[in-house]
Amino acid sequence: GVVDILKGAAKDIAGHLASKVMN
């Protein structure tokens, strides 16, 4: 549902930010 989509997007954003910080 919509909540699952939002959770997935949040995880993707968090992953991108984390990868930028780690580099």
From Swiss-Prot:
Please list the tissues where expression of this protein has been recorded. Expressed by the skin glands.
Keyword Ligase applies? no
Where does the record place the modification Asparagine amide?
23
Q: Look up keyword Transmembrane and say if it applies.
A: no
GO terms for biological process, alphabetical: defense response to bacterium; symbiont-mediated hemolysis of host erythrocyte
Report the main location listed first in the record: secreted
Q: Which domain of life is it from?
A: Eukaryota
Q: Where in the cell is it found?
A: Secreted
Keywords noted in UniProt: Amidation, Amphibian defense peptide, Antibiotic, Antimicrobial, Secreted
Its biological purpose is as follows:
Antibacterial peptide that inhibits the Gram-negative bacterium A.actinomycetemcomitans ATCC 29522 (MIC=210 uM). No activity against the bacteria E.coli ATCC 25922 and S.aureus ATCC 25923, or the fungi C.albicans ATCC 18804 and C.lusitaniae ATCC 56936. Does not show hemolytic activity towards rabbit erythrocytes.
UniProt family annotation: Belongs to the frog skin active peptide (FSAP) family. Ocellatin subfamily.
Protein's UniProt name: Ocellatin-LB2
* Organism, as annotated: Leptodactylus labyrinthicus (Labyrinth frog)
